[in-house]
Amino acid sequence: DVRDVQEMTASNVGLRMVQEEAKLKQMPLTQNFIKTLHKTLLREDYSVFVNLPNGVQSSYVIHAGQYKTRPNSVITRYGTRFDYASPEETPILMRDLVDWYNNAEQEGVLSPVELAALFHYRYIRIHPFEDGNGRIARLMVNFILSRHNYPMIVVRSRNKNEYLEALHQTDLELGPIPSDGAYADIKNIRPFLKYFNNLVANEVYNDVLFVSEKNENVWWYDGERIAFRTPNYTKILNAMRTEPTLT
């Protein structure tokens, strides 16, 4: 599918942007960087068509690199509706989020893991864009971790329910008012922080195993260690990974 290939290409470009920006440790985070990252991921504006109950079709435009102009919400896995910040609130909340991050980073009271977790949670409660918020949130987490010389992390699809449950439990502690979540303190996000700490710890552990692996029969894929009976399989798989045209 052409669209899938385009999205993968845009995601790779976005990841490289994050890696390059993270090297500029003396430069403060800006809203412009977040918007540019969003524009890179979405590539262009596009229309979404929805069918209304009376049989009429409506549409609206998703704007790449621009904050939302329509309210957004989600139906949780428990069937309840959860509202994010309004379009009117969003510019102020995002300004405050970026200002808070830059100040907190300078103060150094929070560890890089705490800083990344709290930024992620606050950002998710704002949901500043009409689409792509999850991808931006995860890229920004890796921007913060990489900026502080931590390994990047991946929320794998098989573990997504655990991630959503950690967010949900934190939402229950803070309540449904978006601004309460957008200004959350580290002590208010304990369920998500516990999940995030474990996620980072597992990533570090896997990285150590990967770099110390001496067995030629072992191949690492999607965070999993796969052992083969002979090294020939791993040689073939590594060749296919580096040369995608091989069949």
Set out the residue ranges of the language-model regions.
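FIC/Doc superfamily catalytic core
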Residues: D1-D131, R135-T247
